[in-house]
């Protein structure tokens, strides 16, 4: 395989970092996006990964802004080359029961978690089609399948992401482009580490596997889906949730 360029949006979070790490280990030239490099400590993050042997590039971009994504795409392809692999990871939460949720918190979650998939994918899918190869993976959530208290915005966005996946897979398959979803369950990250112990134990008690997922569990699924050999897997939703939710 020639070195393919892989773009991972929001790749400096817990799950995103491991995706970047595993794709880099697999021989991809990995680039990520961040909104506020200074606040997010991206330079220190990238330096730590370089110490491990992973040279991860980064560009500043608000993925909720279509025009910003267009500028980002120009910058990425000028510096790193054509993007053949896209992993849409960027996401936020703004939790509240719907009867208490304000419009800004609804819109911000839909913009970052769902509209960003269009904003970013739109910049690269044409090139993938023209080259006859592309791998797009959208990171959704078990809560997009089950719903969750206080997360009408998040659940709607994550459910919508897989609808986006299925439709785009049908459009793109004739051109050698695959589009798939990975839906994590509860994963051990800094966010879940901050949950009170009793709450975290109650969550784990609901998971048949008896543990939280690890970022590596999600990243391995992504690495599998973006491989050249995975070209016949298209429009799928891969649950990585320890049997918390099972469906067909």
Task: Tell me the role of every PLM-derived stretch.
Residues 146-149, 223, 234-248:
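Short C-terminal tail/terminal secondary-structure segment
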Residues 141:
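Residue(s) in the substrate-gating loop at a strand-loop-helix junction
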Residues 121, 157, 165:
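Active-site helix of classical SDR
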Residues 12-13:
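Conserved glycine-rich cofactor-binding loop
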Residues 97-98, 105-110, 192, 203:
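Substrate-binding pocket helix/loop in short-chain dehydrogenase/reductase
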Residues 126, 170-174, 231:
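Alpha-helical segment proximal to the catalytic Tyr-Lys
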Residues 26-43:
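Conserved glycine-rich Rossmann-like NAD(P)H-binding loop of the short-chain dehydrogenase/reductase
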């Amino acid at each position: 395989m020639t070195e393919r360029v892989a773009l991972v949006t929001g790749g400096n979070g817990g799950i995103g970092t491991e995706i970047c790490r595993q794709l880099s280990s697999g021989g991809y030239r990995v680039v990520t996006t961040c909104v506020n490099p200074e606040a997010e400590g991206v330079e220190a993050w990238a330096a730590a990964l370089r110490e491990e042997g992973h040279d991860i590039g980064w560009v500043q971009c608000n993925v909720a802004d279509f025009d910003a994504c267009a500028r980002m795409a120009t910058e990425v392809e000028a510096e790193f080359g054509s993007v053949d692999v896209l992993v849409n990871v960027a996401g936020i939460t703004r939790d509240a029961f719907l009867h208490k949720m304000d419009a800004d918190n609804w819109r911000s979650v839909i913009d970052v978690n769902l509209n960003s998939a269009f904003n970013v994918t739109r910049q690269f899918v044409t090139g993938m089609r023209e080259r006859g190869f592309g791998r797009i993976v959208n990171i959704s959530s078990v809560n997009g399948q089950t719903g969750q208290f206080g997360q009408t915005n998040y659940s709607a966005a994550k459910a919508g992401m897989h609808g986006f996946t299925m439709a785009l897979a049908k459009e793109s398959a004739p051109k050698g482009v695959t589009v798939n979803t990975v839906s994590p369950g509860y994963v051990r990250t800094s966010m879940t580490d901050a949950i009170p112990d009793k709450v975290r134990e109650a969550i784990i008690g609901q998971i048949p596997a008896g543990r939280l997922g690890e970022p590596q569990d999600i990243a391995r699924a992504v690495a599998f889906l973006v491989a050249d050999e995975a070209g016949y897997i298209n429009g799928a939703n891969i649950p990585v949730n320890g049997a918390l939710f099972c469906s067909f």
